């Protein structure tokens, strides 16, 4: 569900490798802004802040990540409590405590000679058609592969 950062939840080594662990996506799919934080990085070069429509991830993130882009929660997202894991029933409430929380959506890191790139954008394949997201995705993968 959270892709690379939601795999192998029981593996601390994996979490240290990827630099984050997916927690949730309050409000499901909705509009939010992506803010470019490292405009001078080759992955982000020429990309300005942009609006995005998808799941806005809340994650536990390693402070050693080199954050390339973030999103900020508005605090009006709706969070639905699961009465049982995987259940769609439960109480819903507004996430006021998240107001102003800045969450990384793209980062890179190095471990030894290895390079790791992560982007939380792209819940559906058609999101790769979003011009800014597509550039970040491609450039990040190229950076990690060299």
Predicted segment positions?
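Short alpha-beta junction capping motif
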Residues: 1-7, 113
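Phosphate-centric recognition/catalysis
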Residues: 119
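Stable alpha-helical elements in mature extracytoplasmic
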Residues: 10, 39, 43, 133-137
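C-terminal alpha-helix
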Residues: 139-146
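Extended active-site neighborhood of metal-dependent phosphoesterases/phosphodiesterases
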Residues: 5-21
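Catalytic beta-strand/loop cores that center a nucleophilic Ser/Cys/Thr
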Residues: 20-112
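Catalytic cores of NTP-dependent nucleotidyl/adenyl transfer enzymes across multiple folds
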Residues: 122
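A short acidic/glycine-rich loop-to-helix N-cap element
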Residues: 125-134
């Amino acid at each position: 569900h959270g892709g690379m950062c939601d795999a192998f939840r029981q593996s601390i080594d994996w979490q240290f490798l990827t630099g984050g662990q997916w927690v949730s996506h309050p409000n499901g799919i909705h509009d939010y802004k992506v803010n470019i934080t490292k405009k001078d990085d080759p992955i982000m070069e020429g990309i300005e802040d942009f609006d995005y429509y998808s799941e806005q991830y809340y994650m536990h993130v390693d402070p050693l990540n080199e954050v390339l882009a973030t999103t900020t929660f508005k605090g009006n997202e709706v969070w639905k409590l699961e009465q049982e894991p995987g259940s769609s029933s439960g109480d819903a409430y507004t996430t006021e405590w998240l107001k102003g929380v800045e969450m990384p959506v793209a980062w890179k890191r190095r471990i030894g000679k290895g390079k790791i790139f992560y982007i939380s954008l792209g819940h559906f394949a058609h999101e790769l058609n979003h011009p800014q997201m597509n550039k970040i995705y491609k450039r990040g993968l190229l950076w990690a592969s060299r």
